[in-house]
Every structure is written in C-alpha cells, then in structure tokens.
C-alpha cells in the first residue's frame, strides 16, 4: 500500500527508543531527524515537515510521560496526535440530497472515483447518479458507463455531444430522481486555461454543494501548485486520494490537503467499485504507525459477510458460531475475505500486525498467501456437498480423488484440512468466552497495536493464512 514505506520508516525510527524509560535531548534530536527524513522522502512539503518536527520535539522534551509508559510509547502517542492534527478532520459528507463535482488532471482517477463514490452512497441507502461530462478523453464515456453498471447505479452521458456544459445540464434533468449527483469532469495532462474555463462553466450550471479534487497518490510535489490553481478557480472543499494500492510515496497528496486548507474525503485503493473508503484520520494514522484500525476492519467484515450471505441465503454465518464449523463455512469465510479488499490492507487494520510483524515478512508473503487461498478454493470446489459439510469423512481415498479432480497435490489438501481443524478449535474457544473475556482480548489487541509490535494476539488460525 502507498505510504507503507513512510509507515515502516516511522516505525523503524520509533523502535530505536525501545528499552528507554526516559529521553534526553540527544535522543529526541535523533528521533526528530529520523522522522524528518521519513517525511521528506515521502514527498511531504518541507515547511510542513519542519513545523511538524518542531512540535514533536517540543512536546517530547516538555511533556512528562504518564506513569508506566515507556519512552517509545510516549513519543509514539505524540507522533500519532501530531500527524492526525496535520491531516485534519475528514471532509463532511452528509447523507442527504446533494451535488458533488470532481476535478483533477487526466489520469488522476476521477472517472473511477465517481463510480466508487456512487457505489458508496448506494450502500448508505441513497440513490446516486453519475453524470459523465468528459468529452476530451477517448473512452471516458464507455469507462464510466461500464463502472456504473458494475456499481449498479444510475448513469448519464452523451457520446454524440461534444459540449460538456450541455451534457451537465441535460444530465441533471435526466437524473432528477437521484438523491446524489456526482459530476465527473474532463482532465488534461497539465493545468491549461481551457480546462479551468470549462470546469468553471460546468460549475456555473450544476451549482455543486461540494467540489472534490481528485489526486493520484503518486503526484509528488506537483500537488501543491495543482491544488492552488483548482482552489482559486472553483474552491476545493475536499480531496480524494486515489491509487493507494500502488507504490507511490503519497506525501504530495497530503501536502495538497494542507495547501487548500481542506480535508480528505475518500481514499481509493484498487480497481473495483468497492475499493473505496471514507477517510478517518485517526484510523488512517493508526494504521500508518502499525496500531491497526478496528473500526474500518469491522465495517469491512460486516459488509463482506452481508454480501456473501446475500449470494447464498441458505448460509448463516451466526450458525457456525453456535454449532459445527464446516468446510462450507470456511469456504464462505474465504469468499467474504475476497470481498474485504487486498490482504495486506486488511492486515494493516489488525492491531499489532500491520506494523511490527508485517514489516518482517518476506516481500512475496502476500502473494504466497493469496496463492495458497486460491489453491484451497479450487480444492473445496472439487469436494462433494457431503465432504464440505463433514470434513471428517475425507479419508485417504477421498483425498486422492479430490487431488485428481482439483489438480492440487495431496499435501495441499491435508494442509487445508489441518487449517480447518485449527479454525474449528479457535471458534470453539470463542464459544466458551463470556463478554468479559472478549473485552479483555480486544483490550490486549489494542495494547499490542499501541506498541507497534505484538503478535497476532490469538488471531492465528482465524483465517486461512
């Protein structure tokens, strides 16, 4: 994920404080320099870096850590609070009728973002419509139409019209029954006068309640000038940062937020319409520092399980917590995991895992895990309903038959059965837990997250990895 290098670098800087109970000025100076290097290498604006590091240095030297708090955890808390303050609050997005206009350069991800946002609003119970006004880029209409079909939301565009202002006007009329209108505008390879003139004309017609600037996370220092010009032209009320699943540094996009005195509204991190989330500064910085984000994790789990259950109404996820945990349940869990997004993003949300442990994994660990899950899915697709419902009936002869039918080796099938047994045992432990036990476990997870290292906190065996 983008900013992973920044997060890893910051965590590495803080880990140098392990074992220290108190800090002297040399310790603080060294850690501040490390933080400065981390932020500057991620393309965060120099003036922002200096202001942030000055605040961290002052607080680290002047504030007394609470009793029992290590020097590392004290500085971690300060860095967390200062980064949250730097990014600011999330853009307010009311769940009511409104018109939102997207602006940005060509290739920033506006068209994809418009469909993703429409999908997000639809999941909140509103009826959104995307109005595609980009007549400059070949294929813009087709791309927008296809993505809106995948998102199952209303769409308006006119491939035969070359007047974006007319399309915007007619689009509002054609989609008047929609609650939320999302107007996608054209971009250019650079900020040209005709782009600014066009977007100002469209704004005059649609009268948006909110203008969002869409920025590619890879934009770097160029984000500052781009943000300034769009803000002067139409006024930017919020920013959407896209392509967060890439390897870009991301600091330039964060700089643009500060430059426009706005805030971040959404984060885009994949190619499907579901790969979008509302920006929550506390959770975002928490993930960055390896502390997890249980709120976002629970939202993704709830959505994924709900969608999986809707596809198979005979399957009830609550039943597996009451009775036998079958391979069918495991299969459905894996389908739900696929819907939660890239595995590395999900792991970032688990306190104590996203930082310390994930940093130590081999570079290909995520790919290996995904390949293993794919193999498990192929194996289960080759099983009979009886075998899925009663894994204990899968003996040696059945293993050989399943291996032939799935094209997988017998060892991988045995791994699947062993993984199922581990998950079954873990679920039985949950069945025997009272509310107090569950609360203590979650508190333990949070504490491990605060330390940035920790382990899986008992979650090993809860999934096929």
Swiss-Prot record:
Enzyme class: hydrolase
GO molecular function: 7S RNA binding; ATP hydrolysis activity; GTP binding; GTPase activity
Chain coiled-coil ranges: none
Binding site for GTP: 104-111, 184-188, 242-245
The protein's Enzyme Commission number: 3.6.5.4
Alphabetical list of SUPFAM superfamilies matching this protein: Domain of the SRP/SRP receptor G-proteins (SSF47364), P-loop containing nucleoside triphosphate hydrolases (SSF52540), Signal peptide-binding domain (SSF47446)
Compartments, record wording: Cytoplasm
Main location, first listed in the record: cytoplasm
Keyword hit for Nucleotide-binding: yes
InterPro entries: AAA+_ATPase, P-loop_NTPase, Signal_recog_part_SRP54_M_sf, Signal_recog_particl_SRP54_hlx, Signal_recog_particle_SRP54_M, SRP/SRP_N, SRP54, SRP54_GTPase_dom
An annotated GO BP: SRP-dependent cotranslational protein targeting to membrane
Gene ablation phenotype (knockout): Cannot be disrupted, it is thus essential.
Sorted UniProt keywords: Cytoplasm, GTP-binding, Hydrolase, Nucleotide-binding, Ribonucleoprotein, RNA-binding, Signal recognition particle
Keyword check for Glycoprotein: no
Cellular component annotations (GO), alphabetically ordered: signal recognition particle
Domain of life assignment: Archaea
Reaction catalysed by this enzyme: GTP + H2O = GDP + phosphate + H(+)
Pfam families to which the protein is assigned, alphabetical: SRP54, SRP54_N, SRP_SPB
HAMAP family: SRP54
Family indicated by similarity: Belongs to the GTP-binding SRP family. SRP54 subfamily.
Subunit note: Part of the signal recognition particle protein translocation system, which is composed of SRP and FtsY. Archaeal SRP consists of a 7S RNA molecule of 300 nucleotides and two protein subunits: SRP54 and SRP19.
Annotated function: Involved in targeting and insertion of nascent membrane proteins into the cytoplasmic membrane. Binds to the hydrophobic signal sequence of the ribosome-nascent chain (RNC) as it emerges from the ribosomes. The SRP-RNC complex is then targeted to the cytoplasmic membrane where it interacts with the SRP receptor FtsY.
Domain remark in the UniProt entry: Composed of three domains: the N-terminal N domain, which is responsible for interactions with the ribosome, the central G domain, which binds GTP, and the C-terminal M domain, which binds the RNA and the signal sequence of the RNC.
Identification of the protein by name: Signal recognition particle 54 kDa protein
Source species: Haloferax volcanii (strain ATCC 29605 / DSM 3757 / JCM 8879 / NBRC 14742 / NCIMB 2012 / VKM B-1768 / DS2)
């Amino acid at each position: 994920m983008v900013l992973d290098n920044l997060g890893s670098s910051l965590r590495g800087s803080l880990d140098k404080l392990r074992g220290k109970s108190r800090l002297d000025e040399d310790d603080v100076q060294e850690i501040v320099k490390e933080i400065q290097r981390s932020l500057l290498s991620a393309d965060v604006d120099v003036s922002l870096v200096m202001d942030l590091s000055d605040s961290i240095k002052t607080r680290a030297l002047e504030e007394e850590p609470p009793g029992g708090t290590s020097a590392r955890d004290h500085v971690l808390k300060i860095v967390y609070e200062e980064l949250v303050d730097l990014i600011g609050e999330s853009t307010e997005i009311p769940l009511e009728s409104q018109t939102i206009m997207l602006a940005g350069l060509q290739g920033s991800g506006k068209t994809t973002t418009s469909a993703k946002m429409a999908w997000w609003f639809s999941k909140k119970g509103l009826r959104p419509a995307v109005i595609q006004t980009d007549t400059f880029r070949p294929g813009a209409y087709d791309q927008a139409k296809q993505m809106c079909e995948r998102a199952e939301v209303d769409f308006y565009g006119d491939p035969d019209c070359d007047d974006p202002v007319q399309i915007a006007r007619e689009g509002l009329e054609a989609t008047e029954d929609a609650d939320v209108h999302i107007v996608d505008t054209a971009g250019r390879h650079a900020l040209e006068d005709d782009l600014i003139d066009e977007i100002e004309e469209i704004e005059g017609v649609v009268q948006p309640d909110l203008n969002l600037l869409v920025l590619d996370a890879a934009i770097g220092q160029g984000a500052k000038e781009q943000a300034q010009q769009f803000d002067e032209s139409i006024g930017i009320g919020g920013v959407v940062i896209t392509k967060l699943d890439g390897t870009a540094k991301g600091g330039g996009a964060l700089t643009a937020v500060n430059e426009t005195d706005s805030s971040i509204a959404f984060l885009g991190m994949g190619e499907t319409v579901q790969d979008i989330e509302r920006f929550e500064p506390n959770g975002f910085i928490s993930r960055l520092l390896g502390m997890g984000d249980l709120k976002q994790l629970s939202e993704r789990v709830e959505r994924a399980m709900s969608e999986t259950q809707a596809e198979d109404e005979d399957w009830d996820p609550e039943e597996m917590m009451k009775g036998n945990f079958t391979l069918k349940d495991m299969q459905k869990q894996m389908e739900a995991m696929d819907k939660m997004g890239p595995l590395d993003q999900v792991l970032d949300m688990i306190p104590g895992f996203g930082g310390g442990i994930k940093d130590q994994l081999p570079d290909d660990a995520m790919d290996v895990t995904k390949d293993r899950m794919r193999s498990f899915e192929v194996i289960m697709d080759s099983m009979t309903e009886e075998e899925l419902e009663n894994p204990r009936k899968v003996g040696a002869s059945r293993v050989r038959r399943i291996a032939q039918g799935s094209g997988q080796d017998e060892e991988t099938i045995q791994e699947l059965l062993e993984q199922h047994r581990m998950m079954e045992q873990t679920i039985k432990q949950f069945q025997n837990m009272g509310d107090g036990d569950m609360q203590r476990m979650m508190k333990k997870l949070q504490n491990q997250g605060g330390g940035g290292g920790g382990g899986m906190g008992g979650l090993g065996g809860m999934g096929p990895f």
